[in-house]
Amino acid sequence: MAGGEGGVTLGQPHLSRQDLATLDVTKLTPLSHEVISRQATINIGTIGHVAHGKSTVVKAISGVHTVRFKNELERNITIKLGYANAKIYKLDDPSCPRPECYRSCGSSTPDEFPTDIPGTKGNFKLVRHVSFVDCPGHDILMATMLNGAAVMDAALLLIAGNESCPQPQTSEHLAAIEIMKLKHILILQNKIDLVKESQAKEQYEQILAFVQGTVAEGAPIIPISAQLKYNIEVVCEYIVKKIPVPPRDFTSEPRLIVIRSFDVNKPGCEVDDLKGGVAGGSILKGVLKVGQEIEVRPGIVSKDSEGKLMCKPIFSKIVSLFAEHNDLQYAAPGGLIGVGTKIDPTLCRADRMVGQVLGAVGALPEIFTELEISYFLLRRLLGVRTEGDKKAAKVQKLSKNEVLMVNIGSLSTGGRVSAVKADLGKIVLTNPVCTEVGEKIALSRRVEKHWRLIGWGQIRRGVTIKPTVDDD
C-alpha cells in the first residue's frame, strides 16, 4: 500500500496522477478524471430475491466476486457488505453502434485502451467508475441502507426470468427502495437463457403490471444473462445514461463510517516493521487526504469505577489511502475506501473498529448513550411467509423495557426501550455511538430467534457523554 512521496501517487503509472500540492477540492466533481481513474464515485445497490443472481451480475460487470466470507453471520452484527468496483468505458468511434460501444472492466484497468471490435477504430475511454454494494439479505440491506452506512445513489432490481413475478420478497424489495427514497432504478430480468421467448415476454408483462404505481414505475427492464454475460453492455449503457451523477459534498470536513477494520501485520513481524491498523468504509462527505490528522469516535470505550461509560477518542494520522488495489492521495465519497493509519493494529484487528466514525480532528459529532427518537413501524414483518397465521407477521407495538437491535451508521448495538408514547421513544444504548440529531436509525426485534427489521426512526435528541482526553 505504498503511498506516494511528497503527496504524489507513484503506483500504477497507467492511472491518472493525483497530486496533493495542486488539489483544489472546490473544483472536484464525481466525474473528475483524476478521481474516477482510481476510485468509484457512484454507489449502486443490488437488490433481489435469494439466488436470483445478484452476485453473478456484479461479477459479470466488474469481474469481482463479492462473496468473500464464510463466517458471514457468526456474530449477528457484522454483516459484510460486498463492494465491487467497475469502470465503464465508451468507444469514441461514432460509427460503432450502441450498445457495443459500452464496456465494463475492473477498477485497475487503464483509463483508455484501443478498441478490439473488428471494423472500428479509436479508443475506449473511461466515463464512469461505479461501486456495487452487494448485500446478503434484504432486511440487512434495508437496515444498512436505512441507517446510511452506505450512500446509495441507485439500485439494480433483479428478477429471475425462470420464476413467476412477483416472488414473495420482491414486493418487500420495492418497499425497501421506497423507504430509501431511491429514485433511480434499473430492473434486470436475469437468467433469460433458461426460458423461451414467449415466457420472457409474459414475465415482462408481469413485471410491468407489478411495478405500476410503485417507485419503479417507468424503470427500464433489461433482459440479461449474467452467467453468459449477455446484454451486460446494455446495463453499462443504462448506468451511464439513466443514472444521473449524484451531487456530492467535497468541501465539508470529511467523515467516514467504518464498516471493516483489520490488522495487516503477519504474525512474527519485527517491531520496527509493524504497520498501523487499516479501517475500511464509505466516505459520506468531504475528502480525506494522505498525511491528514484524524480522530476516531467513540474510540476506546470503557467503564469507570461506578460503572459509567467512558469514551476516549483515538487520534491518528492517515499514512495511505486505497480503493480496491489502487493507491490514492485523496479519497472522495463513493465506493469502499481503505484508510491506512498509525493506530495500534490491535485496536483494528478483526473488525473491532466497525461502527466507529473517522474524520477530521474536532469536527466529528457528539457521542450518544441514550437516544430520543420519532419512529415508524412497518405494518408487517418482512420476509415472513404466513398464510394462515396473519397475526404472527404483524409488527407489535414497542413495549417498555424490551431490547431491540439498533443500527446507527455501521454500528449494530442493543438498545433498551426506556419510555414510549405514540410515535416517540427513548432508547438506552448498550454501546455509545457517534452520531447526530436528524440521522436515521433502523430498529430490529428478535422474532423466532432472528433479528427482523420492524421499523426505523429519526434521532430527535439524546444524552451525550463527554469524551475523555489524555493530558499529555
Curated annotation (Swiss-Prot):
tr-type G domain: residues covered: 39-248
Subcellular location: Cytoplasm, Cytosol
Entry's EC annotation: 3.6.5.3
Superkingdom: Eukaryota
Modified residues (N-acetylalanine): 2
UniProt record, GO biological process: cytoplasmic translational initiation; translational initiation
Region annotation G4: where it falls in the sequence: 190-193
Chain sites annotated for binding GTP: 51-56, 190-193, 225-227
Modified positions (Phosphoserine) in chain numbering: 16
Record Pfam families: eIF2_C, GTP_EFTU, GTP_EFTU_D2
Alphabetized GO MF terms: GTP binding; GTPase activity; methionyl-initiator methionine tRNA binding; translation factor activity, RNA binding; translation initiation factor activity
Enzyme class: hydrolase
Residue ranges, annotated region (G2): 76-80
Region (Interacts with Cdc123): 457-469
Record bears the keyword Iron: no
Further details from the record: Encoded by an chromosome X-linked gene which escapes inactivation. Has a homolog on chromosome Y (Eif2s3y).
Its biological purpose: Member of the eIF2 complex that functions in the early steps of protein synthesis by forming a ternary complex with GTP and initiator tRNA. This complex binds to a 40S ribosomal subunit, followed by mRNA binding to form the 43S pre-initiation complex (43S PIC). Junction of the 60S ribosomal subunit to form the 80S initiation complex is preceded by hydrolysis of the GTP bound to eIF2 and release of an eIF2-GDP binary complex. In order for eIF2 to recycle and catalyze another round of initiation, the GDP bound to eIF2 must exchange with GTP by way of a reaction catalyzed by eIF-2B.
Name of protein: Eukaryotic translation initiation factor 2 subunit 3, X-linked
Gene this chain is encoded by: Eif2s3x
